[in-house]
Amino acid sequence: MTLYDENNLHIIKDNLRYLKLLSKQYPSISSASSEIINLQAILNLPKGTEHFISDVHGEYESFTHMLKNASGVIKRKIDDVFGTSLRECDKKNLATLIYYPEQKLDLIKKSEKNLEDWYKITLYRLIRLCQIVSSKYTRSKVRKSLPSDFAYIIEELLNEQGDRVDKQEYYNSIIETIIDIDRASEFIIAISNVIQRLVVDKLHIIGDIYDRGPGAEIIIEALSKHHSIDIQWGNHDIVWMGAAAGCEACIANVIRISLRYANLSTLEDGYGINLLPLATFAMDFYKEDNCENFKPRTIDKNLNETDIKLLSKMHKAISIIQFKLEGKIIKRRPEFKMEERLLLDKINIKEGTLNLNEKIYKLIDTNFPTLDKENPYELNERERDLVEKLTNSFINSEKLQRHIKFLYSNGSLYLKYNSNLLYHGCIPLNEDGSLKEVTLCKETLKGKSLLDKLDRLAREAYFFKKDPESKLYGMDMMWYLWCGPNSPLFGKKKMTTFERYFLDDKNTHKEQKNPYYKYRNDEKMCTMIFEEFELDADNSHIINGHIPVKTKEGENPIKANGKLLVIDGGFCKAYQPQTGIAGYTLIYNSYGLLLTSHEPFSSIHKAIVEGNDILSSTTILEHVSSRKRVLDTDSGEEIKKQIHDLEMLLVAYRKGLIKEENEANIRF
């Protein structure tokens, strides 16, 4: 406790106004003292487990399972608690029951001959496991995690030892009564959910919830129910956020990507976006065009020829609209320095060629029915009407707006948390490895100041509805964050979408990465970034996503001698043949850092019926000799400040600077 005497009493007097407010919450020496004791005890608890996941790309089945099994944490807890006293098949079944209690119980009820015995054994096991996973938390925190229906019973069972002679009958009778009154199934579901909740104290999603997968909206719905989460926006998230804000270029990009991968379920079923006007438009303008280069890329999708033809026409129609809308932004914002992406005016329709960087290329598709040679970036009347309808659909989708507000409320471009720096893409660098200076709004920025400014502009794009000029600039910046040359989310010099559709020469398809990726193995670069973000280089890590780790080719996700960790989740099935695995996740618990690599997930159905889990292997990156405590974390720093304030309040009471409330008044 800080000792205050006559020499430093002025500190308390300077803070007297604040301390009087604090005294409303702690109106006596007794209440302030109790809170200090409580907070001091919390500081000495083990730090909670953090779970890091990145690049989900809409693959909701794999993600849902990863969330439920906490990247193998639950299985490790089962091993720790039961060791060799349980067969491997029993451990597997117990784990599956915790992941999917409702579905697994339905199967067990059909197959188990002596259900009462099974209930009794399972309840004892679940309670024992829950006692272990809850042991690092205060009773108050555990109590808040319990479902109201069973809160009292679970709390009693967690705080009683079934092997204590004086309480054994009491403990056993609770379990027997649960079974006798036919509430065992509901209790198993409740305690399984409590275990799932308590094994992970904090969830970090390092970008790209959205993309080509079929269930981004399912993922966000699940995340919105999570007890403690933060999100670092990815490039695919930002383009959806821009679309929800009303940025027309972002809307066109979102629709184009969905059509490219024949994934319309998120748009149509998830968010109720009406694509019929686009289908009508595409059939009118591209009726005789087979749109060969716009056929959707499909994995595990059975589409008939009619569907493919329609999707191809819609895909081409929205792509041309996208290039026009992007051209308007590039012309409106010369500070973006993206003039080389103005390609529509470089097309020679008569010759069927494109002048790209003073070199002539043959176009593989020369049908541009909506292109005006004199004004190639102008939308025709039908296109303008279509864009307005699509924009209204995005702006008026209640579910989309709710989900995007969730991303804003819980997300940011980067996060400093417990000495780790989390961001999705990169910190823009020059070729020599120094921080890249970027001019925005007449300010020249780099590193942390650049990301802080971009974060503010992204919020203005959505929330500045009464300031049209600021909102428009923010929306243009959202598009820049998606594909701009100095975007920390994109991390490349240019996005060659047009070239991939219209040119055969593969050299024109290349997208040069920011020099950041060249220096990822350089400890000096990491140290420079830590200093820029005011972190201790000796005790910090950069946790990064965005670029899949090509494990098959021998690439290591651990960079710069462990200073930088790449955990692209690898959920996207299209990348798995290139990477050789289904990506990496990270666990940071009180014992250290564990990097887990995962094999591809089969399906939730197989996980429930056959007990198939994601096959994972874990690498211990750092192991501490003494467990990290809450006092070693960011939360610990906040608690220390609270304790300091309460200590000042105690002195203020004892010196008579603030009067205690009458005990009778406090009680009544």
Curated annotation (Swiss-Prot):
Pfam families: FBPase_2. Its cofactor is Mn(2+). It is an enzyme of class 3 (hydrolase). The keyword Manganese applies. Pathway: Carbohydrate biosynthesis; gluconeogenesis. The keyword Manganese applies. Keywords: Carbohydrate metabolism, Hydrolase, Manganese. Its EC number is 3.1.3.11. InterPro entries: FBPtase_class3, Metallo-depent_PP-like. GO terms for biological process: gluconeogenesis. It catalyses: beta-D-fructose 1,6-bisphosphate + H2O = beta-D-fructose 6-phosphate + phosphate. Gene3D superfamilies: 3.60.21.10. One of its GO terms (molecular function) is fructose 1,6-bisphosphate 1-phosphatase activity. Belongs to the FBPase class 3 family. This is Fructose-1,6-bisphosphatase class 3. The gene is fbp.
